[in-house]
């Protein structure tokens, strides 16, 4: 059925077919079919580069499977996407940063960064109830995601999503038991990036009790000011600096 659907997409000149799968599902025959039916991008759920973390979370694959699958995908001329999860059972911020480094070494076209949430009815919920798993706080998740985002950008890897899509299934009552969920998680990460940049400028220029104008596209204004103007308030309270954003086209 999926082959027929993909073939129909190709016939209609839809050229952007994107697929997501496990790294241990990739083989030569599957990739040949993907090429035949016009698949442009394959994303792999890496989750972690630590085999210990993968085993603890019963992922059913090791990081060597990711390396093998990534190289095969690229050898077929298909764009590679890699997805990582922050704060998995058995992980910590430095382990997550190492996962980011190893993902960069595989030279993907794009990546996604997801925080781990404790969902109702899962094995992770049982670990959480027993006190064996402590999820990241929102602050830790944002801080770690920020570090990964900056590393990916420096390496030229496009980050196409930060945070889980807040759909109805995820947000249904009682579904999220614990963890760093925020409907605008990606925006919080971008806020943190701008906060660091602006604070560095304020310190370097020794700004105090003054207006500080930032020229930026209108699309960046909310990221600079922060959720509920948190960045703006932070700089005024700490330095007496009043952030003002002047929009330019772009």
Residue ranges and their predicted role:
Residues 1, 30-38, 49, 177-182, ...:
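Short, charged low-complexity intrinsically disordered segments located at boundaries
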Residues 3-116, 120-140:
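Conserved non-cysteine loop/helix-boundary elements of the Radical SAM core domain that shape
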Residues 123, 130-250:
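Auxiliary Fe-S-binding modules of radical SAM enzymes
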């Amino acid at each position: 059925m999926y082959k027929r659907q993909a073939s129909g997409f190709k016939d209609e000149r839809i050229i952007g077919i994107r697929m997501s799968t496990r790294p241990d599902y990739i083989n030569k025959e599957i990739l040949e079919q993907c090429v035949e039916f016009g698949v442009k991008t394959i994303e792999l759920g890496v989750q972690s580069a630590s085999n210990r973390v993968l085993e603890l979370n019963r992922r059913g694959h090791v990081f060597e499977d990711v390396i093998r699958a990534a190289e095969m995908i690229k050898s077929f001329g298909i764009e590679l996407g890699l997805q990582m999860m922050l704060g998995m059972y058995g992980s910590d911020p430095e382990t997550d940063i190492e996962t980011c480094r190893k993902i960069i070494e595989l030279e993907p076209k794009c990546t996604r960064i997801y925080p781990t949430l404790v969902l109702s009815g899962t094995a992770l919920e049982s670990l959480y109830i027993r006190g064996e798993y402590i999820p990241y706080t929102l602050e830790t998740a944002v801080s770690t995601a920020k570090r990964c985002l900056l590393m990916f950008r420096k390496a030229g890897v496009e980050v196409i999503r930060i945070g889980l899509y807040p759909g109805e299934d995820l947000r249904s009552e009682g579904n999220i038991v614990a963890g760093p969920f925020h409907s605008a998680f990606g925006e919080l990460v971008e806020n943190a990036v701008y906060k660091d940049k602006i604070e560095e400028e304020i310190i370097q220029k020794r700004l105090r009790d003054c207006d500080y104008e930032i020229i930026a596209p209108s699309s960046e204004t909310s990221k600079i000011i922060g959720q509920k103007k948190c960045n703006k308030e932070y700089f005024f309270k700490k330095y007496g600096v009043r952030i003002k954003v002047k929009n330019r086209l772009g």
